[in-house]
Amino acid sequence: MKLADLEIRDLHVSAEDKEILRGIDLDVERGKVHALMGPNGSGKSTLANAIMGHPAFEVTEGTITFKGEDLTEADPDVRSQAGLFMAFQYPVAIPGVSVSKYLRMVINAHREGRGEEAIKIKDFAKVAQEAMELANIPRDFSSRYLNDGFSGGEKKRMELLQLALLRPEIAVLDETDSGLDIDALRTVAEGVNRFAGPEMGVLIITHYQRILHLVKPDFVHVMFEGRIVKEGGPELVGVLEEKGYGWIREEVAASPTGGGV
């Protein structure tokens, strides 16, 4: 039996002394698209932040293992260098730092973690241009300040550019469809479909179904009150679209354990 690349076992996570995740089990492997759904406040973004090691979220029980290595206590940069990536719901703007400069800093941080020399400017220019073409982003994008004055769609394209440049093994997309019009949503979906493949697994976190009409998931996981309570294939998206989350609440309430798949 093939082991998953990212394995989460009995994960309990707290923030500000409040338990948010209450025993998460989840496997994500390269070559597959996973959708993590659930109503607002169910703990989806907390799970994403815990995967990446955000210091505001404390793992109190359980483990996060990536490619056989326990990363539960690892710093965020270690996780990133190992091949994990997260696209944030609300990317931060950094006035005064160009997209090009930021991307070169990110690449060099990864190279330093592998014990390699900093990338030469001409080599960076080549790989950056290739990534921009792959992500369908105009060349003048690189000279703009990072996310400064960017529209919602442009911020998401910036995340796609990082995907194209870094080629992570597992990409966590935290509500990357939030606030996008249909054209921007199509752009994001096209990028995800372009990059997802045998060498990259994707975990799409959303409480909407619309992006999942454009990016077909292999597996769907539904969260409620800090637990994954339902799992299935892409057909589960249609059920949630038709019925909403009310029936999930009813199933959880009727369960002797108050949860469970």
How would you name each of these model-derived features?
Residues L163-A164:
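ABC ATPase C-loop
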Residues M37-P39:
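The feature captures the beta-strand-to-loop junction immediately N-terminal to the Walker
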Residues M223, R227-E250:
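Conserved beta-strand-loop-alpha-helix hinge in the C-terminal portion
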